């Protein structure tokens, strides 16, 4: 099976995996912990194994790190985890000043599969909810908690100012 290991964290809301990428100390584990507090399940922390499965990419924990999450100031904690979930969203961590208000839909590719990609300021109070909404929207589902369905497609926007489609 084709795969690669990436420096990231991953959580899942149901069957939707969210890969959280960023530099060391950027807040990946902290955001994953807040996602778990909001109902997500840990997949992996610090390193994530990505595998191609048909037309999807699945995320898995390395065996030595399975069920472990680093909590800064506390240490390594053991949590329930999933061993494999399809990725629905990739989140790149950035500062609040660098995040566009109404960004064009972004895409990333792993193992030849395109996956929706967004930028998030990890320490904003709303970051966990933003990720959950974006993950459900990326796979065309309404969020089960709020019923909200975010508009990821430029044609779904109400401002009428967006041009073009995502690039292949």
Where are these regions (language model features)?
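A short, structural micro-pattern
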Residues: 5, 83-85, 112
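Short, acidic/polar N-cap/turn motifs at the starts of alpha helices
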Residues: 8-10, 47, 105
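Pre-Walker A adenine-sensing motif
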Residues: 1-11
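Glycine-rich phosphate-binding P-loop
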Residues: 11, 15-36
């Amino acid at each position: 099976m084709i795969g690669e290991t990436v420096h990231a964290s991953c959580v899942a809301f149901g069957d939707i995996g969210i890969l959280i990428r960023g530099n060391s100390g950027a807040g990946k584990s902290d955001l994953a912990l807040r996602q778990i507090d909001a109902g997500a399940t840990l997949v992996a922390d610090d390193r994530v194994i990505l595998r191609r499965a048909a037309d999807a990419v699945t995320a898995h924990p390395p065996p030595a790190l399975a069920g472990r999450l680093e909590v800064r100031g506390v240490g390594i904690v053991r949590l329930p985890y999933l061993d494999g979930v399809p990725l629905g969203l990739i989140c790149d961590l950035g500062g609040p000043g660098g995040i566009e208000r109404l960004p064009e839909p972004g895409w990333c590719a792993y193992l030849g599969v395109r996956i929706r990609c967004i930028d998030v300021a990890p320490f904003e109070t709303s970051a966990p909810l933003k990720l959950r909404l974006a993950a459900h929207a990326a796979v065309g589902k309404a969020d089960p908690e709020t019923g909200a369905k975010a508009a990821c497609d430029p044609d779904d926007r109400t401002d009428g100012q967006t041009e073009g489609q995502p690039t292949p």
